[in-house]
């Protein structure tokens, strides 16, 4: 009897777990970098924190509209400060499937660069990669007691980054694939210079327990790049590219998808509006033709009547002239 009860309970547990897994929504965490008193990099006309938030929210809109089955979580949706560790904790508590952090690059005064690049967690292969990681990680110095929180990690010391050389794990391969998808789609779709996919020691990525990547949208310290990153149309192009890179990744790895997701509808010009405008234009043309057709007919009739009247007058005049000539 005890064996039967145990078997029944085991089967019930399996059914519950299966149902839970089947009903579980794919969870994406979008992380707009910086915020609040942490402005991030500064440009001549804007702050990094605002650019990051603008692109992140637009990217999220594409996901929410085209993938309603995806649960989208933002680490922030307003101008507030969120510690790096808490950003990762938000993703870990939600048992997220993917973590994408959105940032904007910068260079010291006098240097110019352009382009879009994507990072995954790992040991930097070049000094430029280390510089980017150091700049992004320096935000922890704004957190109270950060030495204890991050176990003595010093974002300004290159020695602290040696630990990233030994970080591997099951998430590495998928993170790199996600980064490559996003890099390819944004650079081709938004016509951005391709600065490639790199690895570097980002604390926010180290603390997450799922595949993740960090995006650098462009260089806020380069004048034309900053203008581009503040242009609503270009922001939409970039957000759409990020979405399409994410969709390509999900089509491959989310086994619950029966029909692959296609490219997103354009945010700025909805498809329904295009169809509606076309129909309206056709109706207007038909109405115009209907109005102008009678006028052309009347004019033709008037012209014919005038010609006939002129012919009759000429005939009468000829008849009157004949006796005089005789």
Question: What does each model-identified segment do?
Answer:
Residues 1-5:
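Positively charged n-region of N-terminal signal peptides that target proteins for export
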Residues 6-16:
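Bacterial N-terminal signal peptides
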Residues 15-16, 43, 115, 228:
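Hydrophobic alpha-helical membrane context
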Residues 21-153, 168-172, 176-180, 236, ...:
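Catalytic-core regions of hydrolytic enzymes
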Residues 40, 159-261:
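Active-site-adjacent mobile loop/cap segments within catalytic or ligand-binding domains
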Residues 153-159:
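Intrinsically disordered, low-complexity segments enriched in small/polar residues
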Residues 294-326:
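Long, low-complexity, intrinsically disordered segments
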């Amino acid at each position: 009897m005890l064996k039967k009860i145990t078997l029944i309970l085991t089967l019930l547990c399996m059914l519950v777990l299966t149902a839970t897994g089947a009903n579980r929504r794919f969870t994406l965490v979008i992380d707009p970098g910086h915020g609040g008193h942490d402005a991030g990099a500064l440009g001549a006309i804007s702050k990094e924190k605002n650019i990051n938030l603008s692109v992140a929210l637009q990217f999220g809109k594409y996901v929410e509209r085209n993938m309603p089955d995806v649960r989208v979580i933002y680490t922030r949706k307003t101008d507030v400060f969120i510690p790096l560790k808490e950003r990762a904790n938000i993703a870990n508590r939600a048992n997220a499937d993917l973590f994408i952090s959105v940032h904007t690059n910068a260079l010291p005064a006098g240097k110019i660069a352009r382009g879009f690049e994507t990072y995954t967690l790992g040991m930097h292969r070049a000094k430029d990669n280390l510089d980017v990681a150091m700049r992004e990680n320096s935000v922890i110095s704004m957190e109270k007691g950060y030495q204890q929180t991050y176990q003595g990690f010093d974002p300004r010391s290159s020695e602290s980054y040696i630990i990233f050389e030994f970080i591997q794990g099951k998430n590495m391969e998928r993170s790199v694939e996600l980064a490559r998808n996003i890099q390819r789609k944004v650079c081709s779709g938004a016509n951005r210079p391709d600065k490639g996919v790199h690895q570097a020691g980002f604390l926010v990525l180290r603390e997450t327990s799922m595949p993740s990547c960090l995006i650098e949208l462009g260089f806020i310290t380069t004048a034309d790049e900053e203008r581009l990153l503040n242009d609503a149309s270009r922001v939409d192009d970039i957000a759409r590219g990020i979405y399409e890179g994410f969709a390509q990744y999900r089509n491959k790895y989310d086994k619950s998808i029966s029909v692959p997701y296609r490219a997103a509808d354009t945010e700025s010009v909805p498809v329904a509006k295009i169809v509606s405008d076309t129909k309206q234009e056709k109706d207007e043309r038909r109405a115009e033709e209907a109005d102008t057709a009678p006028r052309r007919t009347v004019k033709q009739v008037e012209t014919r009547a005038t010609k006939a009247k002129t012919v009759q007058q000429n005939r009468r005049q000829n008849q009157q002239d004949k006796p005089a000539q005789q």
